[in-house]
Amino acid sequence: MRVILLGAPGAGKGTQAKFITEKFGIPQVSTGDMLRAAVKAETELGLKAKSVMDSGGLVSDDLIIGLIKDRLAQPDCANGVLFDGFPRTIPQAEALLKAGLEIDHVLEIAVDDEEIVKRMSGRRVHEGSGRIYHTIFNPPKVECIDDVTGEPLLQRKDDVEETVRHRLSVYHAQTKPLVEFYSKLEAKDGKPKCSHIPGVGSVEEITAKVLEALK
């Protein structure tokens, strides 16, 4: 079973990805991890990618597809794979299709933008321990102070509202169109199966919907 998991930053993809990989015994494959592994192993594709990255360029979709083919040939992918962060764009999805790499399921975890902004911009972190609080959902006893050490809490740069809104706009421009792309493919060819899952409610409720969609 090959699964693509889509959703805006902050939609809760990480939690559901962990559930899917454990439940179905398939690896989570990210292009970043593949690139690093190929470069470290000094494979032919890894050396090509390193040359491009060292010169400040972007690794081409063709090169990424080559890495994916190599990765899918490994024994742990025999039962399937969960794609993490790929494809991100229509050209990448088309390249995947052209390479004959079939996808069985496309899951979109859908959460309203304002809910995501509320979730992410409210996060506060204790740098020393990594403890995470939230101004609304899990506030510290004293505002902006760690419960255990009494030290100040920080807001990560990625969680600043302006940054969150920028990342959401990039997602809507580049990755959201993939939902329509794969839905049209499903209507035409009968696969991949596309499922739209509301990412609100408890983790358990969302997980149950994910499991139902993958049956």
From Swiss-Prot:
Pathway: Purine metabolism; AMP biosynthesis via salvage pathway; AMP from ADP: step 1/1. AMP binds at T31, R36, G57, L58, V59, G85, F86, P87, R88, Q92, R156, R167. Gene3D superfamilies: P-loop containing nucleotide triphosphate hydrolases (3.40.50.300). Keywords: ATP-binding, Cytoplasm, Kinase, Nucleotide biosynthesis, Nucleotide-binding, Transferase. One of its GO terms (molecular function) is ATP binding. InterPro entries: Adenyl_kin_sub, Adenylat/UMP-CMP_kin, Adenylat_kinase_CS, Adenylate_kinase_lid-dom, P-loop_NTPase. GO terms for cellular component: cytoplasm. This is Adenylate kinase. It comes from Pseudomonas savastanoi pv. phaseolicola (strain 1448A / Race 6). The lineage of its organism: Bacteria, Pseudomonadati, Pseudomonadota, Gammaproteobacteria, Pseudomonadales. The gene is adk.
